[in-house]
């Protein structure tokens, strides 16, 4: 019996398609910014390599840790409310990344153009305001990581789930590819200011996603199903006592530590090695390109 609302072609609901579409926009926004985050922190805000890598690393680590808690809360309040919260926070965060340098320039601490000229910003505590801005992004992103994949699971049946997740990962990687494609031509046109303006693009993508959720997303699933903090803690302790699972987690963690260098260190390395005409976005796009080409297989 079909009890899912507004079930569309090939067994998928409208909520499924909306979820995947906003995931596409969110991934475009995320990767457009994340591929140059460490460069933004150094070239726009004046952080040295160590400071930039620490801020970027803590941001990335928190983004993967917080879904343990935000996912449980999302189950309690429902996917629609969670998506609205997530995309609202992401929009504020990305637009904040764009506006913040303008405020620093207005204060006389820096001048932006094809190249950046610092007028005391590297010695100013004002640049650390970036941390709460990134924290807002971290919270919003942590909701998305748990919501969309769970929504795909809820909006598919046993017969359509495999294809549903193929579509989901296709959207993830199309978004990743598109987002990372934008920054290199933008750098060629306006220089280092591209690291500022790319945030407005990401903000626009998450605002579009927010409007899509508000206007189009309807689902009857997963309100009031979340676990309590005690249940989350009990589950965590069970994981910590399962040594086979811990070994698997360590192996997977090692892979992601290496993979994250595509964003943490590779862009700076490539630009410093090959010059300002280098295209780190295209190098990082090898991964999503291969996934998109092979996902159907």
Residues covered by each model-derived region:
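Juxtamembrane intracellular "pre-TM" segments in multi-pass secondary transporters
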Residues: 1-13, 222-250
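Short amphipathic helix-loop junctions that connect adjacent transmembrane helices
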Residues: 35-51, 264-281
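Central cavity-lining transmembrane alpha-helices of secondary-active solute carriers
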Residues: 57-72, 286-297
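C-terminal ends and interior cores of transmembrane alpha-helices
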Residues: 88-124
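Symmetry-related core transmembrane helices of the 12-TM Major Facilitator Superfamily/SLC fold
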Residues: 131, 196-215
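Intracellular juxtamembrane helix-capping segments at the cytosolic ends
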Residues: 143-157, 270
């Amino acid at each position: 019996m079909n009890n899912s609302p507004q079930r569309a072609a090939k067994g998928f609901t409208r909520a499924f398609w909306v979820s995947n579409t906003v995931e596409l926009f969110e991934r475009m926004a995320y990767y457009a910014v994340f591929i140059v985050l460490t460069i933004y922190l150094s070239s726009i805000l004046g952080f040295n390599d160590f400071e930039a890598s620490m801020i970027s690393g803590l941001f990335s680590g928190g983004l993967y840790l917080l879904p343990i808690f935000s996912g449980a809360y999302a189950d309690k309040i429902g996917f629609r409310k969670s998506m609205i919260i997530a995309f609202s926070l992401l929009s504020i965060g990305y637009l904040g990344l764009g506006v913040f340098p303008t405020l620093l320039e207005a204060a006389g601490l820096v001048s932006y153009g094809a190249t950046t000229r610092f007028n005391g910003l590297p010695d100013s505590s004002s640049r650390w305001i970036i941390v709460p801005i990134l924290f807002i992004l971290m919270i919003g992103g942590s909701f998305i990581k748990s919501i969309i994949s769970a929504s795909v699971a809820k909006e598919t049946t046993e017969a359509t789930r495999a294809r549903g997740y193929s579509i989901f990962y296709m959207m993830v990687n199309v978004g990743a590819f598109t987002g990372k494609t934008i920054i290199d031509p933008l750098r060629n046109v306006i220089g280092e200011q591209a690291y500022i303006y790319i945030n407005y693009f990401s903000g626009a993508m998450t605002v579009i996603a927010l409007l899509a959720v508000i206007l189009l997303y309807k689902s009857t699933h997963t309100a009031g199903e979340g676990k309590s903090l005690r249940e989350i803690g009990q589950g965590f302790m069970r994981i910590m006592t399962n040594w086979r699972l811990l070994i698997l987690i360590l192996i997977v963690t090692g892979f992601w530590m290496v993979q994250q260098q595509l964003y943490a260190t590779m862009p700076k390395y490539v630009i410093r090695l090959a010059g300002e005409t280098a295209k780190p976005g295209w190098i990082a796009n090898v991964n999503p390109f291969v996934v998109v080409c092979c996902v159907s297989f």
